[in-house]
Amino acid sequence: MNRLPSSASALACSAHALNLIEKRTLDHEEMKALNREVIEYFKEHVNPGFLEYRKSVTAGGDYGAVEWQAGGLNTLVDTQGQEFIDCLGGFGIFNVGHRNPVVVSAVQNQLAKQPLHSQELLDPLRAMLAKTVAALTPGKLKYSFFCNSGTESVEAALKLAKAYQSPRGKFTFIATSGAFHGKSLGALSATAKSTFRKPFMPLLPGFRHVPFGNIEAMRTALNECKKTGDDVAAVILEPIQGEGGVILPPPGYLTAVRKLCDEFGALMILDEVQTGMGRTGKMFACEHENVQPDILCLAKALGGGVMPIGATIATEEVFSVLFDNPFLHTTTFGGNPLACAAALATINVLLEQNLPAQAEQKGDMLLDGFRQLAREYPDLVQEARGKGMLMAIEFVDNEIGYNFASEMFRQRVLVAGTLNNAKTIRIEPPLTLTIEQCELVIKAAHKALAAMRVSVEEA
């Protein structure tokens, strides 16, 4: 039987939620009630699958851990008052920490004036952010399209490449094995995870995948496409594959891909949604090899963990295909004043506090600690790898990875797996993580692995 809509029920639900938003603290009974509500509503109205996922990576199979608020720049507090060091970072959005005061203040100040733009008058913050991004990014990148997420930034990049290359008879895209570029239809066509792709087949035509980090495979693909008349419009790849398991290519790989793109007249699209904004020890990961893409995709940390925003930045030559008709690709909320305020403040904090350099220093410290653990626990850990504050611990099988996440949860450290590699747990904390907190994370990992070894031996 169909359920009839109820205005009274919706009004009561919204009033209850607004009352909750106003609260700063909850007593014990309120916490228990909120936990029950959240679990019920996820099950009945969001997606029960999320509960099972959460259950697999929390202590004792308890999926009732409900986030309440930020504890500090680098910690989260749940409804039971437990504080966790955040080594997941919202999959890479909290580069400047949780509720960074500079970012929050910028958004609050803009909120007091005008939250969203009229769409008809020119909005100053979008102009200022575009100018700032042009100054920040490498090479000839000059014009920015702002959106709301990473997958949208990739969609814009693909459409931009198509618009530029179609008159030249180039329609093919080359992506890489293990890649993750998002889950909208175009971005999913470049993503290389069958689990995400198969339910939505057929995807966009013209996409080919080659092994990541294999420059000869890239050359062969470009050659074959040229021979068959399927000339390549663009190569799209991540400088370091995040969801693929924090996979680093061989030194010189990006430089070699850039040369191949120039040789074959293909555009180079770099997806720095996860690696950008200081995460790897440089503002952008491509700067480790001084590589300059034709199109750059940003999102996640660009909004400072306060507002969602993505960006697609291109050279004037490429972006000029949109000059005659700027409405060829637009979005209602992209580049809104609140998001632009957050992004401007985020860039300011990253530069003022030199957080990319801090990411390199602290990342080296953490990675040294994890590699030492890999040597101590070779029966459990296959490898620790990373660059800057984007790291991964790969285990000998999938189950051990899940167990490690659960044990770290018991140690009050949040970690999680990568979407394309179940054996791998990512370590992606805020760049503001303190040295003391870095040491606590390494100690927690040691305790987690020791407990896991005991469990294996007892079994």
Curated annotation (Swiss-Prot):
The modification N6-(pyridoxal phosphate)lysine is found at K300. Pyridoxal 5'-phosphate binds at G150, T151, Q274, T332. Pathway: Amine and polyamine degradation; putrescine degradation; 4-aminobutanal from putrescine (transaminase route): step 1/1. GO terms for molecular function: diamine transaminase activity; identical protein binding; putrescine--2-oxoglutarate transaminase activity; pyridoxal phosphate binding. This is Putrescine aminotransferase. Its EC number is 2.6.1.82, 2.6.1.29. GO terms for biological process: L-lysine catabolic process; putrescine catabolic process. Its cofactor is pyridoxal 5'-phosphate. Keywords: Aminotransferase, Pyridoxal phosphate, Transferase. The keyword Isomerase does not apply. Catalyzes the aminotransferase reaction from putrescine to 2-oxoglutarate, leading to glutamate and 4-aminobutanal, which spontaneously cyclizes to form 1-pyrroline. This is the first step in one of two pathways for putrescine degradation, where putrescine is converted into 4-aminobutanoate (gamma-aminobutyrate or GABA) via 4-aminobutanal. Also functions as a cadaverine transaminase in a a L-lysine degradation pathway to succinate that proceeds via cadaverine, glutarate and L-2-hydroxyglutarate. Belongs to the class-III pyridoxal-phosphate-dependent aminotransferase family. Putrescine aminotransferase subfamily. InterPro entries: Aminotrans_3, Aminotrans_3_PPA_site, Class-III_PLP-dep_AT, Putrescine_aminotransferase, PyrdxlP-dep_Trfase, PyrdxlP-dep_Trfase_major, PyrdxlP-dep_Trfase_small. It catalyses: an alkane-alpha,omega-diamine + 2-oxoglutarate = an omega-aminoaldehyde + L-glutamate; putrescine + 2-oxoglutarate = 1-pyrroline + L-glutamate + H2O; cadaverine + 2-oxoglutarate = 5-aminopentanal + L-glutamate. The keyword Transferase applies. SUPFAM superfamilies: PLP-dependent transferases. It holds the Pfam family Aminotran_3. HAMAP family: Putres_aminotrans_3.
